[in-house]
């Protein structure tokens, strides 16, 4: 059973998936930082100094705890998603372009088999004798 698991875990697809998940997690952190620390402050400045993470709507009812709808945080998370989705789209587009270029390369002429080479030699010898 251990051997079976070892074969499964060391297959190329499983390792590729693991690497993809790790890189994807790190990329997600980079995008979150980009949105939180660069894009949203600039966007907040453009629209009048608004801090999007602080945007919220509070629903209150007498005698109960208030319910807070943090729509600013939702806007920020939506920006995260859009940037990640666009980045993945561009990556797939570039990857597809490279794959198409590889497929379009003409295949080199196949090397003649031993039989074909022998037949060519026999033909050449017969031509020489005829002349």
From Swiss-Prot:
GO terms for molecular function: mechanosensitive monoatomic ion channel activity. It comes from the Bacteria. The chain crosses the membrane at residues 8-28, 30-50, 72-92. It holds the Pfam family MscL. It is a multi-pass membrane protein. PROSITE patterns: MSCL. The keyword Transmembrane applies. It is found in: Cell membrane. InterPro entries: Mechanosensitive_channel_CS (IPR019823), MS_channel (IPR001185), MSC/AndL (IPR037673), MscL_channel (IPR036019). GO terms for cellular component: plasma membrane. Keywords: Cell membrane, Ion channel, Ion transport, Membrane, Transmembrane, Transmembrane helix, Transport. Channel that opens in response to stretch forces in the membrane lipid bilayer. May participate in the regulation of osmotic pressure changes within the cell. Homopentamer. Belongs to the MscL family. This is Large-conductance mechanosensitive channel. It comes from Alkaliphilus oremlandii (strain OhILAs) (Clostridium oremlandii (strain OhILAs)). The lineage of its organism: Bacteria, Bacillati, Bacillota, Clostridia, Peptostreptococcales. The gene is mscL.
